[in-house]
Design a protein with these regions (language model features):
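Membrane-interface interhelical linkers
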Residues: 1-22, 71, 122-124, 135-162, ...
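Transmembrane alpha-helical segments that form core, pore/gating elements
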Residues: 4, 93-152
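C-terminal transmembrane-helix exit sites in multi-pass transporters
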Residues: 9, 54-75, 148, 195-214
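Juxtamembrane helix-entry segments on the extracytoplasmic side of multipass membrane proteins
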Residues: 13-16, 84, 89-109, 146-162, ...
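Cytoplasmic-side transmembrane-helix entry/capping segments in multi-pass membrane proteins
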Residues: 16-26, 69-81, 99-104, 123-135, ...
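Hydrophobic alpha-helical transmembrane segments of multi-pass membrane transport proteins
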Residues: 21-39, 104-116, 147-185, 222, ...
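Helix-helix packing/entry segments at the starts of transmembrane helices
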Residues: 47-52, 120-136, 171-202
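Hydrophobic transmembrane alpha-helices of multi-pass small-molecule transport proteins
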Residues: 72-89, 212-231
């Protein structure tokens, strides 16, 4: 990202520094809560609760961004949400474990982050958003690195670089999507992450999904198709 910014002679002038800092802080906090939750409650529970963030984002979009309430998008989101629950099969025991509520707070914080990304995408070029937010995230990451850093070997370094490249590429596409449409439209597609994880799990680790996982993945796909087919129907009607 830095090389692209330098190559294009980008002027990094932002009047939205508070938004950038808040967005980066929300991202770090949300991920930290997710990782902490996995330690104390089943991983499927932590991930399932955290994946409520698109629902929070849709609610916030209505009140903060003044986006219209569209029933078809909510139907698509809840179909995908149901697919996620089927796929992960969480126990969701809120009564006996306070860390479940911590993960719920993390999901809300991630929902806030999505709204902040939408606000930034309407005010600044996406490359500038990528550069500034990753710079801030790097500076935040220096603090825990001081205490826990271990020199990676060559293969670990390649893996870390690959992860970073994948994350930046994902952010690139996500920012472009946010810039071009409403938050409530994008929300159902968040759950497709689990479908791709299942496919990659099969390709790289030979893990064959069971029938319940396939049903969950199918529901997630149906949620995404529900919006697209409805849009295409309107275009060709």
């Amino acid at each position: 990202v830095s090389l692209i910014v330098l190559f294009k002679n980008f002027e990094l002038k932002s009047s939205n520094l508070r938004l950038h800092i808040t967005r980066s802080a929300c991202g770090w906090t949300g991920v930290a809560i997710l990782f902490s939750g996995v330690i104390f409650i089943p991983a499927s529970d932590a991930v399932a609760i955290t994946f409520l963030n698109p629902v929070f984002a849709m609610l916030l979009a209505i009140f903060v961004l003044k986006e219209r309430f569209k029933i078809n998008r909510w139907i698509a989101t809840f179909i995908s949400l149901l697919g996620m629950l089927v796929l992960l099969r969480p126990t969701l025991d809120f009564e006996s474990n306070i860390f479940a509520y911590l993960c719920l707070a993390g999901a809300f914080i991630m929902g806030v982050e999505i709204i902040l990304i939408k606000l930034l995408s309407e005010r600044e070029p996406f490359l500038q958003i990528l550069f500034i937010n990753n710079l801030i995230a790097t500076l935040i990451g220096v603090v825990p690195m001081i205490f826990f850093f271990k020199v990676p070997n060559f293969f670990q370094l390649i893996e870390l670089i690959s992860i970073a490249a994948a994350m930046v590429l994902g952010q690139f596409f996500f920012l472009n999507a946010m810039k071009g449409t409403e938050t409530t439209f994008i929300a159902p597609f968040f759950y497709s992450t689990l479908v791709f994880v299942m496919i990659l799990d099969l390709i790289f680790f030979g893990v064959i999904p069971d029938i319940i996982s396939l049903i969950g993945a199918s529901l997630i796909i149906v949620g995404g198709l529900f919006i697209n087919l409805r849009i295409n129907f309107k275009l060709f009607k």
